[in-house]
């Protein structure tokens, strides 16, 4: 959920308090709290640094104006400082705009086939490969947690975990969620299916769900008594030996009916751990959506971005065109997009989101 605009004075006080707390050995006796405080401190640091630069530039401008009263050679310096102040003011305003607290997070992404039978499943697999290739371009790690394949090798459904930890690219500091949070919704494809003998273009669709993954499972309260855990024999593409033991795990959260399965890790314990992480992500998303609905039923969510029944994008193969209906984006490079070249589209979506946030300032 987007955070409200905050006063710079409040943030400066919080930053100073966190700096003192992080220097206190007592805080580090609770590693989880120490990590939480450290993440918040790191989040505030660039805001504080920009504010200090702005104050310094304003002081320099005042001095330059006083000196210019007796020496016209300072006029150029005044113009430079005024330009610098305008730039810093814009940066600080952007930083203080409502932001997404999950920006640095990794994600769990689900792809599900929809109407269209086998063609929809094949398209769902195309989407999964598109996201995997995009992640590879950025040095992110992708783990296929669960998958159900169709007769022709498509995906009836697949669950991916995408992590930026250890990545070396510059975008990684913002997290996977900040780049991929706009992907949730219905994706429509227009093309000639492999099963079409008459060469006619068909329309089908697949759904994508995206959840920010909590830094730690403990950040989301899950009562063990609310869980039913079943184990069974894996049936995915886990390689030789994957089917020989009951290593797959299915977890049902009884109060909500949410079911999570994981079968592609090498052991039952690993599958259970990953399934709990996915469950935590889903429950966190559900809680935030409910809180948002309670706060304002008619306000557009910047985290969920669209109703999941809404068509957000069309992939037109005959024209090699991709269209994002939310922002009116069109490009004739569908082949490149499906190969993971998504940055131009994601930049456009991020720019539209930024503009929306700035309007709330």
Swiss-Prot record:
It is found in: Cytoplasm. PANTHER family: LD18447P. Belongs to the prokaryotic/mitochondrial release factor family. Keywords: Cytoplasm, Methylation, Protein biosynthesis. One of its GO terms (molecular function) is translation release factor activity, codon specific. The modification N5-methylglutamine is found at residue 240. GO terms for cellular component: cytoplasm. It comes from Mycobacterium leprae (strain TN). Peptide chain release factor 1 directs the termination of translation in response to the peptide chain termination codons UAG and UAA. InterPro entries: PCRF (IPR005139), Pep_chain_release_fac_I (IPR000352), Pep_chain_release_fac_I_sf (IPR045853), Prokaryotic/Mito_RF (IPR050057), RF-1 (IPR004373). Methylated by PrmC. Methylation increases the termination efficiency of RF1. This is Peptide chain release factor 1.
């Amino acid at each position: 959920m987007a955070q409200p605009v905050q006063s710079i004075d409040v943030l400066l006080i919080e930053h100073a308090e966190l700096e003192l707390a992080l220097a206190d050995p007592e805080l580090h006796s609770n590693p989880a709290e120490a990590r939480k405080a450290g993440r918040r401190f790191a989040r505030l640091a660039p805001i504080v640094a920009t504010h200090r630069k702005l104050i310094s530039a304003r002081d320099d401008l005042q001095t330059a104006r006083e000196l210019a009263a007796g020496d016209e050679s300072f006029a150029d310096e005044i113009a430079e400082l005024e330009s610098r102040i305008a730039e810093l003011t814009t940066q600080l305003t952007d930083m203080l705009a409502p932001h997404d607290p999950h920006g640095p997070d990794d994600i769990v992404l689900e792809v599900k086939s929809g109407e269209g039978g086998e063609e929809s499943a094949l398209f769902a697999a195309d989407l999964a490969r598109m996201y995997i290739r995009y992640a590879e371009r950025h040095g992110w790690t992708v783990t296929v947690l669960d998958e159900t394949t169709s007769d022709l090798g498509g995906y009836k459904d697949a669950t991916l975990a995408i992590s930026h930890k250890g990545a070396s690219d510059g975008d990684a500091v913002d997290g996977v969620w900040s780049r991929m949070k706009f992907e949730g919704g219905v994706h429509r494809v227009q093309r000639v299916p492999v099963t079409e003998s008459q060469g006619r273009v068909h329309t089908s669709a697949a759904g994508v769900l995206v959840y920010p993954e909590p830094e730690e499972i403990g950040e989301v309260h899950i009562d063990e008594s609310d869980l039913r855990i079943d184990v069974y024999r894996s049936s995915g593409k886990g390689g030789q030996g994957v089917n020989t033991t009951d290593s797959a795990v299915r977890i049902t959260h009884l109060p909500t009916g949410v079911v999570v399965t994981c079968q592609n890790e090498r052991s039952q314990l690993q599958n259970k751990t990953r399934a709990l992480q996915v469950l935590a992500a889903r429950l966190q998303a559900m809680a935030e959506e409910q809180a948002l609905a309670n706060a304002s039923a008619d306000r557009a969510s910047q985290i969920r971005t669209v109703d999941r029944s809404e068509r957000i994008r069309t992939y037109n193969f005959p024209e090699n065109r991709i269209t994002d209906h939310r922002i009116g984006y069109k490009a004739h490079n569908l082949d490149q997009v499906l190969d993971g070249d998504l940055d131009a589209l994601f930049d456009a979506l991020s720019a539209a989101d930024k503009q929306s946030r700035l309007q709330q300032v």
